[in-house]
Swiss-Prot record:
It comes from Picosynechococcus sp. (strain ATCC 27264 / PCC 7002 / PR-6) (Agmenellum quadruplicatum). It is found in: Cytoplasm. SMART domains: DeoC. It is an enzyme of class 4 (lyase). This is Deoxyribose-phosphate aldolase. Belongs to the DeoC/FbaB aldolase family. DeoC type 1 subfamily. HAMAP family: DeoC_type1 (MF_00114). Keywords: Cytoplasm, Lyase, Schiff base. Pathway: Carbohydrate degradation; 2-deoxy-D-ribose 1-phosphate degradation; D-glyceraldehyde 3-phosphate and acetaldehyde from 2-deoxy-alpha-D-ribose 1-phosphate: step 2/2. Its main location: cytoplasm. Its EC number is 4.1.2.4. PANTHER family: DEOXYRIBOSE-PHOSPHATE ALDOLASE (PTHR10889:SF1). The gene is deoC.
Length: 228
């Protein structure tokens, strides 16, 4: 049964993302400050920003997520392993790992499994496997999701946002596969309260967005005059 909209604490779902390639150190600090202000569970950043976030968020209960193989996933396994390990050493407490979609398209299930499982085993931190759902058929989404489950990921992430946004249909599909065993991070094009609520009601447990502040401001504005 879907969570009633007026009972959803939006802030605890929002993973505040700063994945613009030209983001400055000052903007990284602003991202982290917003996470503190709104009590977001995590920030999601490029590997080069992890040390800055670690120092800024020192001893605060906010997860620091680094992307790996982002945004295309077309890196060698050795490169992804190095990038993942370095990110953790620099302070990342979670990793969003872009899958090698060619493995999915070619049905190379064992190669995909081995890559993801090695990252899970090496880093010992929660891994979110990014499916890039806009580029996959439903059959391919199911295959990738099941391989990620077997490999030990903690979340499935719908999208990077670079090749198309997340949809309620995709979240429902992934939730039907996972059945609550792991989390689902919806990401890509989430800009409004209505979008956020619909995705949560579909089964998302995290929402990755650069619009977290605007969403919270919108929620505060409409809270006195709810339309749900």
């Amino acid at each position: 049964m879907a969570i009633p909209a007026n009972e959803i604490d939006l802030a605890r779902y929002l993973e505040h993302s700063l994945l613009h390639p030209a983001a400055t150190e000052a903007q990284v600090k602003e991202c982290c400050e917003a996470a503190v202000q709104f009590d977001f569970p995590a920030v999601c950043l490029y590997p080069t920003a992890i040390k800055t976030a670690r120092d800024f968020l020192h001893q605060r209960p906010i997860q620091i997520c680094s992307v790996v193989g982002f945004p295309a996933g077309a890196h060698t396994t050795a490169t992804k392993l190095y990038e993942a390990q370095e990110a953790v050493e620099n302070g990342a407490t979670e990793l969003d790992v872009m899958l090698n979609l060619a493995f999915v398209k070619m049905g190379e299930s064992e190669k995909l499994y081995q890559e993801v499982a090695q990252i899970v085993e090496l880093t010992k931190v929660p891994i979110k496997g990014i499916l890039e759902t806009a580029l996959l058929t439903d059959t391919e989404k199911r295959l990738a999701a099941e391989i990620c489950l077997d490999a030990g990921v903690s979340y499935l992430k719908t999208s990077t946002g670079w090749f198309g946004g997340t949809t309620v249909a995709d979240v429902k599909l992934l939730y039907g596969i996972t059945k609550g065993r792991i989390g689902i991070k919806a990401a890509g094009g989430i800009k409004t309260v209505d979008q956020a609520i619909a995705l949560i009601q579909a089964g998302a447990t995290r929402l990755g967005t650069s619009r977290s502040i605007k969403i919270m401001q919108e929620r505060e504005q409409v809270s006195d005059n709810p339309t749900w």
